[in-house]
Amino acid sequence: MRLRNKPWAEEMITNHPEVIVPNPEDFKGNWQVVFGNNNPIHIEVGTGKGQFVTGMALQNPDINYIGIELYDSVIVCALEKVLEAKSPANLRLLKVNGADLNKFFNKNDVARVYLNFSDPWPKTRHAKRRLTHGDFLKLYESILVDNGEIHFKTDNRGLFEFSLISISEYGMLLKYVSLDLHANMPEDNVMTEYEQKFSAKGQPIYRLESQFITKL
């Protein structure tokens, strides 16, 4: 995603603590204080402009959603999307690095992780930066409930194949795999901005659902 400087972004972010949680490390292990309930929490790492996480929150009011995004110029777009949707009570955003999730969540805080159209980092020497690399899977496992899930969508065949191998080698269960999601699209599918763009061009969308297996 090309980042365009938005000089007004920082002020807008500061003015909406009801959406973009300040000092999220203070709620580690205690997110029910933020949401006012004990409903399961699903997070999207790399929430981009927020279309997916906002749509999911509106579609599933009994699940709490948190969108993770690092850059001011991007998260402010997600903030605008949330405000347009009248700030659903079950949705928050965090302006943090997705590599630091265990600074903000304890084990069992999160039920599901969504990864949508992540940077493919195509060069071999950058493989560890891919969000489905084993190091990231270990990070997700450290905050997820037992048998927690990862749902992943991409238009990049190479990244998808890498992810299938990485997830399998980690010992996770592959519950669902699609090489063309839109050929038989689930009724409850919520599209991201990238998904709309690529599918309109006829590019296949790859999707998988995977689950950690509780180690005895």
Curated annotation (Swiss-Prot):
**This protein's GO CC annotations:** tRNA methyltransferase complex
What Enzyme Commission number(s) apply to this enzyme? Answer: 2.1.1.33
Which GO terms fall under molecular function for this chain's record?
tRNA (guanine(46)-N7)-methyltransferase activity
Q: Which reaction does it catalyse?
A: guanosine(46) in tRNA + S-adenosyl-L-methionine = N(7)-methylguanosine(46) in tRNA + S-adenosyl-L-homocysteine
The residues annotated as the active site are 119
Top EC class per UniProt?
Answer: transferase
Where does the signal peptide begin and end? Answer: none
Q: Which InterPro entries match?
A: SAM-dependent_MTases_sf (IPR029063), tRNA_(Gua-N-7)_MeTrfase_Trmb (IPR003358), tRNA_methyltr_TrmB_bact (IPR055361)
What the protein does comes down to: Catalyzes the formation of N(7)-methylguanine at position 46 (m7G46) in tRNA.
Q: Which PANTHER family match?
A: 3-DEOXY-D-MANNO-OCTULOSONIC-ACID TRANSFERASE/TRNA GUANINE-N 7 - -METHYLTRANSFERASE, PENTACOTRIPEPTIDE-REPEAT REGION OF PRORP DOMAIN-CONTAINING PROTEIN
* Protein family: Belongs to the class I-like SAM-binding methyltransferase superfamily. TrmB family.
Protein name according to UniProt: tRNA (guanine-N(7)-)-methyltransferase
Please tell me the species this chain comes from: Lysinibacillus sphaericus (strain C3-41)
Record gene name? trmB
